[in-house]
């Protein structure tokens, strides 16, 4: 623990000369800036090379690409214990990225730390708070008006603490990162679960909670459990209607939503070269849906081409020089290997209600009829951080153009979300946007929009059964439109476009015919489009705010009466005792994602106000006692009521509580609010069969106990009316289970074992009340 403590106590002095950023240490053979926006921050391939050589010599074996990049960023490569799936690594990420919904809490925590500046290059991206209603410009104007307080806070906090700020309308965080900040070999953390998008450019890009981002921005080594590595070998060539999206839809069907947990998915093999750089990004992006720590592709000519086209030929040239360190070693070993022949891969569509329910497009209509899913498609939606590249828009436009040539338009409503201002401006210039409008589409703002529930949908009523198809990444119940009866399917943008034209799930564009306006039948040809524009990208409007060199006079104000922002109060420390007689707030039945724990959509406006957003705590989770959402028994009054109200009652009356969950609890978004809220309302532990990686870490960061049943069947021993006592906290130690006494209302008791994954540093967080509390302790 000494190195951690030493670093924190020296932060105030060290940050003045930026000692903790990798770009400031040692000389280098070539000085190439990380980005155009940070000309004095350099890529350190020489340090990466040095660290890789140290680790390879220690381990005495070939390394995977994932290992090279991760171990190449070790804080102490000569002495760090390294064992896949077991040890915790202390890493030095190159940069941090935050989107506006998570940046609020991250920056509030950073302000609480008392530090003057961020220690690594960091950016804030305004993409989550723009609601889709009428179309791009109108929706953007409305969002700027409604969210002015939050945008002003983020802009001034960025200016004060040295964080770059991308204004609303600039685009989706992951597209901006790919266009400007990602590069081969980078280690980047982002406060969004789809940060792995950057793996399409050969980087290790990992989604985290805001508290993790605060550690990195503070210059503290970031902890990550040493990931296992799943190899996906690609052979053959993508062609026809089959797209990069189909690779990850197929992988999701194989590995399921938790099959990648604790692992990096590393794509390799001859088939890689048939996939564009942005296509590789699509595959890595949706790796979040299998629970993977991240996903990555090896550096190749496709990445070089993309870097050059986005104005970063100097980075491409430097990557060529260090190419041997940006690909896996021959003979490296994976923990698991999946092989996919791209020649045999068919277009896929996954859903509804879970992204791992995979179907070939040719079969989904038949399956839908059998299952009673609505066949008529109400809305087709393309775009999102997963599929909004120039190539995606071009392939969709190629499909739309064929329909227009035969006098057809979309039978379904159709929306288009450009991934960035650069993509929007370029597809406008090159005619793609107009083709998509002509076929019946509405171009939305450069933002997340309906993908995260920012959709003011008017065509149905809540509870109305319907089907939508999207090129998004997630299709959890109610995620896009807050309607639990919306059957959402995810597929490629070109398949979405074809299905929106046909209007039904029973249409297979590979084999089925459409009838043109003239009554003649025709078949859509497989789309073909340029992966990058033939001329340069059109950058569109300038939407970036540089942090000033001198920010000493910059104020960051938070009104005490604000309903959108709230300064944080420290959580209480552990009292040194076991947790006695914990009330069960809810025993959750089945899937419980972070959308169920802390809903997005209309709740996004409260992401900077912990008390207000806590009113959505677990409102989407199903209570096993009555099969209902947001209806739990108050153990004192015996009345059923909303989960947040019951939690507040317990907090007011000094009753500490626990949540019981099922498998893969907390899958999905990286939002740390799903951990902050239960802590704020008096929760002490979350006990489940298993956790999703990011959520488990977020819970630890906020001083909660994420615990798992040593015997998963013990889930069935606990009833919502029981009380639980957790023993062994005085001797809390890594690898040592805790005892849990189940106290039934009839006076009988049972004792079970609970496992945990805490290391010594994380146990310090628990004792201090949170990771932020511990940081402050070490500064004193």
From Swiss-Prot:
Keywords: 4Fe-4S, Acetylation, Iron, Iron-sulfur, Lyase, Metal-binding, Mitochondrion, Phosphoprotein, Transit peptide, Tricarboxylic acid cycle. Forms covalent cross-links mediated by transglutaminase TGM2, between a glutamine and the epsilon-amino group of a lysine residue, forming homopolymers and heteropolymers. Pathway: Carbohydrate metabolism; tricarboxylic acid cycle; isocitrate from oxaloacetate: step 2/2. Gene3D superfamilies: Aconitase, Domain 2, Aconitase, domain 3, Aconitase, domain 4. Substrate binds at residues 99, 192-194, 474, 479, 607, 670-671. Binds 1 [4Fe-4S] cluster per subunit. Binding of a [3Fe-4S] cluster leads to an inactive enzyme. The gene is Aco2. It is found in: Mitochondrion. It comes from Rattus norvegicus. Monomer. This is Aconitate hydratase, mitochondrial. It holds the Pfam family Aconitase. One of its GO terms (biological process) is response to isolation stress. The modification N6-acetyllysine is found at residues 50, 138, 144, 233, 517, 523, 573, 605, 723, 730, 736, 743. Residues 1-27 form a transit peptide. [4Fe-4S] cluster binds at residues 385, 448, 451.
């Amino acid at each position: 623990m000494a190195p951690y403590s030493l670093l924190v106590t020296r932060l105030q002095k060290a940050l003045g000369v930026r000692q903790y950023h990798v770009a400031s240490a040692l000389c280098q053979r070539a000085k190439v800036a990380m980005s155009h926006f940070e000309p004095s921050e350099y890529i350190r391939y020489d340090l990466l090379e040095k660290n890789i050589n140290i680790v390879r010599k220690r381990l005495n074996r070939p390394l995977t690409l994932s290992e090279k990049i991760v171990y190449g960023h070790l804080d102490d490569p000569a002495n760090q214990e390294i064992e896949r799936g077991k040890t915790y690594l202390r890493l030095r990420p190159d940069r941090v990225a935050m989107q506006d919904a998570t940046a609020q809490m991250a920056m509030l925590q950073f302000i609480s730390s008392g530090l003057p500046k961020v220690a690594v290059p960091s950016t804030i991206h305004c993409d989550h708070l723009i609601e889709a209603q009428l179309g791009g410009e109108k929706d953007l104007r409305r969002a700027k008006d409604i969210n002015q307080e939050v945008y002003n806070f983020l802009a001034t906090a960025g200016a004060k603490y040295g964080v770059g700020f991308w204004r609303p309308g600039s685009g989706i965080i992951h597209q901006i990162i790919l266009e400007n900040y990602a590069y081969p070999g980078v280690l980047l953390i982002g406060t969004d679960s789809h940060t792995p998008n950057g793996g399409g450019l050969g980087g290790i890009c990992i989604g985290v909670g805001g508290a993790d981002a605060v550690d990195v921005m503070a210059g503290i080594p970031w902890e990550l459990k040493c990931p296992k590595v799943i190899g996906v070998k690609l052979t053959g060539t993508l062609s026809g209607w089959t797209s990069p999206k189909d690779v990850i839809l197929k992988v999701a069907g194989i590995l399921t939503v938790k099959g990648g947990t604790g692992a990096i998915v590393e794509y390799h093999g001859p088939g890689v070269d048939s996939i564009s750089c942005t296509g590789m990004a699509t595959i890595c992006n949706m790796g979040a849906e299998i629970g993977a720590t991240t996903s990555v592709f090896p550096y190749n000519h496709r990445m070089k081409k993309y870097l050059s086209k986005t104005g970063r030929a100097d980075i491409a040239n430097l990557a060529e020089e260090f190419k041997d360190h940006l690909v896996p070693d021959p003979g490296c070993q994976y923990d698991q290997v999946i092989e996919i022949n791209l020649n045999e891969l068919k277009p896929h569509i996954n859903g509804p209600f879970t992204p791992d329910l995979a179907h070939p497009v040719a079969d989904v209509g038949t399956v839908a009829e059998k299952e009673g899913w609505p066949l008529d498609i109400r809305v087709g939606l393309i775009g999102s951080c997963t599929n909004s590249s120039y190539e995606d828009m071009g392939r969709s436009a190629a499909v739309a153009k064929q329909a227009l040539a035969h006098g057809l338009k979309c039978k379904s409503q159709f929306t288009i979300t450009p991934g960035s201002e650069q993509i929007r401006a370029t597809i406008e210039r090159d005619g793609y946007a107009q083709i998509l409008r002509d076929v019946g589409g509405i171009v939305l703002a450069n933002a997340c929009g309906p993908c995260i529930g920012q959709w003011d949908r008017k065509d149905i009523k809540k509870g109305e059964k319907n089907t939508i198809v999207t090129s998004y990444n997630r299709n959890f119940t109610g995620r896009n439109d807050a309607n639990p009866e919306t059957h959402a399917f995810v597929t490629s943008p070109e398949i979405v476009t074809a299905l929106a034209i046909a209007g039904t799930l029973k249409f297979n564009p590979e084999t089925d015919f459409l009838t043109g306006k003239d009554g003649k039948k025709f078949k859509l040809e497989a789309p073909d489009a340029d992966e990058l524009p033939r001329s340069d990208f059109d950058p569109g409007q300038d939407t970036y705010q540089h942090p000033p060199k001198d920010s000493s006079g910059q104020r960051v104000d938070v009104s005490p009466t604000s309903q959108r922002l709230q300064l944080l109060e420290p959580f209480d420390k552990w009292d040194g005792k076991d947790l006695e007689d914990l009330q069960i707030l809810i025993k959750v039945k089945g899937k419980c994602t972070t959308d169920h724990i802390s809903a997005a959509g209309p709740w996004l406006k409260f992401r900077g106000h912990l008390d207000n957003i806590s009113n959505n705590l677990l409102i989407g989770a199903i209570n096993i006692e009555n099969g209902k959402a947001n209806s739990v028994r108050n153990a004192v009054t015996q009345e059923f009521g909303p989960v947040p109200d019951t939690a507040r009652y317990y907090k007011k009356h000094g009753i500490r509580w626990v949540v019981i969950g099922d498998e893969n609890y907390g899958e999905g978004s990286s939002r740390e609010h799903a951990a902050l809220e239960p802590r704020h309302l008096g929760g002490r532990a979350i006990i489940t069969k298993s956790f999703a990686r990011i959520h488990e870490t977020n819970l630890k960061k906020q001083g909660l106990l994420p615990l798992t049943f040593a015997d998963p069947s013990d889930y069935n021993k606990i009833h919502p009316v029981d009380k639980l006592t957790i023993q062994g906290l005085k001797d809390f130690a890594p690898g040592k289970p805790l005892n849990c006494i189940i106290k039934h209302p009839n006076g009988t008791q049972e004792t079970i074992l609970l496992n945990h994954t805490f290391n010594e540093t994380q146990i310090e967080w628990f004792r201090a009340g949170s990771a932020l509390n511990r940081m402050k302790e070490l500064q004193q």
